[in-house]
Structure formats: C-alpha cells, structure tokens
C-alpha cells in the first residue's frame, strides 16, 4: 500500500526472507539501511521515527502470528478487512468503500486459508449485511460488527 515500508527483515543479515509483489502500479524508493543510520545520527528526530516504524512492524508481525495461530477463518478475514480499513483511513482514503487489489486466492494464501473458505466467508458476511461485495468492490456496511468478530472469543 502507498507509503508503506518493506524490507526491514533484511537489516541484520542483508538478506530478505520474503518478497513483495505490487498489486497495482507502484513506485519504489530504495534506501540502504546504512544510509538511513548515517542520516539518523545527523537528525535525531529521524532516528526516533525509524524506531517507531520498526516497532510498528514488530507489532504487526506479532499480530499476524497470533492471527495464524489462534483465529478462526471468520476472525482472520474480519481482521484482514479491519486492518485494511485502518490503513486506508491513515492515508486519507475511504474506509467504507474500496477496491480489493488482492484476489480471493491471494487473500487465502496471506491468511493461511483455502480459496473456498475465503469465498464462503465473504458470502456469509454479505448475507449478514456486514459487507456488500461486487467482484473486487467492497463496501463496509457494519464496521463495528467486523471489529466485534475480531474480538469474539468463539467466532464460528
């Protein structure tokens, strides 16, 4: 998503453990970490910002591990949509309506779910009036219900 930072996994070893694929036209700005470190020494406010970014990434990764380990399929998809809404809001975009750039299969791969499970869960959310789905166009009708699904101890 625009404005996001990738590649923090390669800071220690210089090798990245994963790859990224742009789902739409994108621009990438490559900045070697040693250059960022040098600039951070000159500008302490930059160092503080870099630490915040790294901390946010640690929290996100931890959340992803919890998601894959402890959440049901419904909770995973609800969490995915809530997270997407929050990221769109942070960029000044609509939280209630958006085009889903990932296919159902890609979402399943990301969430550790089968394509059929993702499709079935989207249909369930649609039937329950939580979201409206027209191919990749998603309209969030009940964001509070989605958030409750993520927090539900026994979402079935």
Predicted features, each with a name:
Residues 41, 45-114:
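Polybasic "coupling" helices that flank or enter modular domains
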Residues 1-59, 63:
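Cyclic-nucleotide recognition modules
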Residues 1-3, 10-13, 48, 80-83, ...:
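Short amphipathic alpha-helical surface micro-motifs
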Residues 23, 31, 42, 68, ...:
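Residue-level signal for short amphipathic helical patches enriched in basic/charged
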Residues 2, 7-13, 38, 67-70, ...:
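Generic structural "secondary-structure junction" signal
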Residues 86-156:
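Phosphate-/nucleic-acid-contacting segments
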Residues 4, 21, 29, 75, ...:
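Residues that recognize and position ribonucleotide moieties
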């Amino acid at each position: 998503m625009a404005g996001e930072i990738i590649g923090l996994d390669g800071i220690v070893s210089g090798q990245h453990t994963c790859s990224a694929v742009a789902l739409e036209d994108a621009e990438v700005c490559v900045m070697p970490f040693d250059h960022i470190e040098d600039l951070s020494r000159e500008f302490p406010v930059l160092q503080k910002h870099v630490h915040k970014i790294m901390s946010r990434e640690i929290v996100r990764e931890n959340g992803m591990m919890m998601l894959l380990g402890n959440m049901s399929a419904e909770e995973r998809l609800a969490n995915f949509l809530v997270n997407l809404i929050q990221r769109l809001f942070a960029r000044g975009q609509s939280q209630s309506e958006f085009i889903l750039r990932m296919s159902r299969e890609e979402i399943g791969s990301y969430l550790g779910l089968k394509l059929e499970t993702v499709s079935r869960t989207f249909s369930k959310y649609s039937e329950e009036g939580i979201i409206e789905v027209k191919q990749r166009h998603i309209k969030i009708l009940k964001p509070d219900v989605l958030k409750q699904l993520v927090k539900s101890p026994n979402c079935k």
